């Protein structure tokens, strides 16, 4: 399988997806036809989200079709060379994909060789479940099971920082709560600016910041760039 799982879409001082474009270009390998899954977008229309994505990827020679705009979305996915899943609200994303019967077709086409690109919520959707999202559950997705393209759980936008005076939980504390009730999980705290690529049977960590892996009953382990999962 070929996957590009990004923690986020924007870095300080850079345009939207600018940091991801070289990574995308490297994994295209001749692929040019993409379907875009915009369903995580809540405060922007799906048409606008699709147009924004298409404009960014046009210089790479990638044509983008919004999955919400086609008559037969399952067929569009089955014929896609690239599946792109944008960030936003993960619960809304999973709900729409489940209701439209898109989860199995996405899994199948990626396993057959299509490239999967997802950022934030799109990275969460590639995991076994969406239980490590940071998002508010604004809708009920009728279960948390997701695509299971990547075998570990990703927590995107990972940071353990707390504003001064804030009394809520740190991100690690929230991850530890999940590991109490689901100790079988391995959770990757993927900070902004980092990504995981899956190519030719290898999953590799990239990016400038320290990523952490969390397991039940163990201290968090820092992972360096180039780590293979």
UniProtKB/Swiss-Prot annotation:
Chemical reaction(s) catalysed: Dipeptidase E catalyzes the hydrolysis of dipeptides Asp-|-Xaa. It does not act on peptides with N-terminal Glu, Asn or Gln, nor does it cleave isoaspartyl peptides
SUPFAM superfamilies referenced in this protein's UniProt entry, alphabetically: Class I glutamine amidotransferase-like (SSF52317)
Active-site residues, record numbering mapped to chain: 120, 135, 157
Entry GO terms, CC: cytoplasm
Family matches, as InterPro entries: Class_I_gatase-like (IPR029062), Peptidase_S51 (IPR005320), Peptidase_S51_dipeptidase-E (IPR023172)
Cellular compartment(s): Cytoplasm
Enzyme Commission code(s) on record: 3.4.13.21
Keyword Protease recorded: yes
Enzyme kind, highest EC tier: hydrolase
Source superkingdom: Bacteria
Name assigned to this protein: Peptidase E
Organism field: Escherichia coli O81 (strain ED1a)
Gene designation per UniProt: pepE
